[in-house]
Amino acid sequence: MNKQQLKAYFMLMRLHRPIPILLILWPTLTALVLASHGLPDISYLVIFTIGVVVMRTVGCIINDIADVDFDKHVARTNTRPLTSGQLSIKNAIWLCISLTLVAFICVLFLNLYTILLSFVALFLAILYPFCKRFFAIPQLILGLAFNFGIFMAFSTIQNQIPVEAWIFYIATICWTIAYDTIYALADREFDLEIGIKSSAVLFGNKVFRYILLFNFLSLLLLIILGIYCDFNSFFYLGVVICSLFFVRNYFLYKKLGITNCINAFSANHWIGLIIFIIAVIQYI
C-alpha cells in the first residue's frame, strides 16, 4: 500500500474532519457522566471514545458506498476516494467490515444489555445513508444514530434507560436536526437537482425558522433535564451560553454559501463541549 492509498483511506474514514466525531463524542461522554453521577471509570471513557471514532468512520464509509453515484454530481463531494476512483467499492466494504469488528470487540467488554443495543446502533448507521432517497427528513434518522451512544452509556452504567436518558436523547436529536440542516444548506441546490431529500429541501424558504425551532426545543429539553435532575445554577448558565452560540450561528448561516454553512455547522461542537462541562460541574 503506497502513500497515496493510505491518504485515500484516511479521507474515506473522514479522519481529516474531526468535528462530526466531536458532535457524537460530547453527548456520549456527557451521558456517561450523567449515568455515573460523576466521572465514570476510565475504562468506559476509553471504550466509548474508541467506539465513537470507529463507528463514525463506519458510517462515513457506508454513506460513501451508498452515495457513490450521487456524489459525482455535487461539487463538495466529487473528489471523494470512491467517487474519484482512488479506492474501489470492494476496498471500502472490507475496511467497513474490519472497523465494525473493532467496534464490536469494544462492546464485548460491556454488559449484555449494551451489546444488544449495539445492534440497534449499527442498524441506524446503515439506515441513514439510504433514507435520503425516500425519507423527507433524514436528519431525524441521523439524530437517532449520532446520539444512540447516550442509551448505551446509561445501559452500561445503570443497566437501564431512565427518564433522564430519554430527555437528553430527544434534546440531542433536536440539536442534530438543527445543525445538520445547516450542513444540508450547503448542498441544497445540488440535492434539488439530483432528487436527494433533506430537511433543508423540505423546509424551503422557512428553513431558518425551523433551525431556530429545533435549537429552541433542544434548549427547552435541557432545562427540563436540569429540573428533573435537580441541577444547580451553573447548568442553566451553560444553557444560556449555548443559546448565545445558536444566535451567533444564525447570523452566520443566514448568509448562506458553503463556507458560512460549514463554519456554522462546525461551531456546534462547542455547544456539545459546554454541555459536557456543565454536566461534570454538577458532580464536583
From Swiss-Prot:
GO terms for cellular component: plasma membrane. The chain crosses the membrane at residues 19-39, 42-62, 85-105, 107-127, 134-154, 165-185, 211-231, 233-253, 261-281. It is a multi-pass membrane protein. It is found in: Cell inner membrane. Its EC number is 2.5.1.39. It catalyses: all-trans-octaprenyl diphosphate + 4-hydroxybenzoate = 4-hydroxy-3-(all-trans-octaprenyl)benzoate + diphosphate. This is 4-hydroxybenzoate octaprenyltransferase. Its cofactor is Mg(2+). Catalyzes the prenylation of para-hydroxybenzoate (PHB) with an all-trans polyprenyl group. Mediates the second step in the final reaction sequence of ubiquinone-8 (UQ-8) biosynthesis, which is the condensation of the polyisoprenoid side chain with PHB, generating the first membrane-bound Q intermediate 3-octaprenyl-4-hydroxybenzoate. The gene is ubiA. GO terms for biological process: ubiquinone biosynthetic process. The keyword Oxidoreductase does not apply. Gene3D superfamilies: UbiA prenyltransferase. Its main location: membrane.
